[in-house]
């Protein structure tokens, strides 16, 4: 299990939203590159980055900040928000990004996702953002009629490296992960699932390490880390102990 610290970018700054609302953004750091380096120094293995402005605009809007992050950390970075074309994907991977996250385009043009997986094997994830059980698109601004599992199953066998599942109704309010919907998704597909939205405490980390959650690749934490509700040392120690137990 991997704990992914999150950097959400708005106007070149690290922010966290409440319930996906761009008007409810709290600035946590004005230097995203320094934040990325700090997460690496704390012992995290990956970094999850979202270009919030890009998600709404449909193209990269915080490119300079993302490039600074890539230069500042040796950790692999996954990026979502505004990545809509094969050219976008190729350009970011060429700059050192480990994995792109395709969200809106996965709904609008699933064939592009399949082609991206063929062209860039191991480097493409799908982001599924849900509100009321339905998939949301365009930076969470629009709701679709598509169900979460219905969308995920479209990519079985395509080579998608992970599904990042965000419960918008839990995001940024420290309400705890929606375990029912998250585990239902993980049980419905063979693609590894990463939980996002609501991770609130060490109890949530412990819950992820229980046997029925083993299908999860990991979880993303934002506000709980920034607010000090999750101690990185304790969380990473729990994960390390769990891995040791699995390999013993």
UniProtKB/Swiss-Prot annotation:
Give GO BP annotations, semicolon-separated: L-histidine biosynthetic process; L-tryptophan biosynthetic process
Q: Tell me which GO cellular component terms the UniProt record holds.
A: cytoplasm
User: Which domain of life, per UniProt?
Assistant: Bacteria
Which top class of enzyme applies to this chain? Answer: isomerase
**The keyword Repressor is assigned to this record:** no
EC number, as in UniProt? 5.3.1.16
> Which residues act catalytically here?
8, 129
Under the GO molecular function aspect, what terms does this record hold?
1-(5-phosphoribosyl)-5-[(5-phosphoribosylamino)methylideneamino]imidazole-4-carboxamide isomerase activity
Q: Which residues form a coiled coil?
A: none
Keywords associated with the record: Amino-acid biosynthesis, Cytoplasm, Histidine biosynthesis, Isomerase
Residue pairs linked by disulfide bridges in the UniProt entry: none
Q: Which Pfam families is this protein grouped with?
A: His_biosynth
Pathway terms, separated by semicolons:
Amino-acid biosynthesis; L-histidine biosynthesis; L-histidine from 5-phospho-alpha-D-ribose 1-diphosphate: step 4/9
Is Amino-acid biosynthesis a UniProt keyword of this protein?
A: yes
Q: Which reaction does it catalyse?
A: 1-(5-phospho-beta-D-ribosyl)-5-[(5-phospho-beta-D-ribosylamino)methylideneamino]imidazole-4-carboxamide = 5-[(5-phospho-1-deoxy-D-ribulos-1-ylimino)methylamino]-1-(5-phospho-beta-D-ribosyl)imidazole-4-carboxamide
Compartments it resides in:
Cytoplasm
**PANTHER family (alphabetical):** 1-(5-PHOSPHORIBOSYL)-5-[(5-PHOSPHORIBOSYLAMINO)METHYLIDENEAMINO] IMIDAZOLE-4-CARBOXAMIDE ISOMERASE
**HAMAP family (alphabetical):** HisA (MF_01014)
What family does this chain come from, according to its entry? Belongs to the HisA/HisF family.
- The name of this protein is 1-(5-phosphoribosyl)-5-[(5-phosphoribosylamino)methylideneamino] imidazole-4-carboxamide isomerase
**Origin species:** Rhizobium etli (strain CIAT 652)
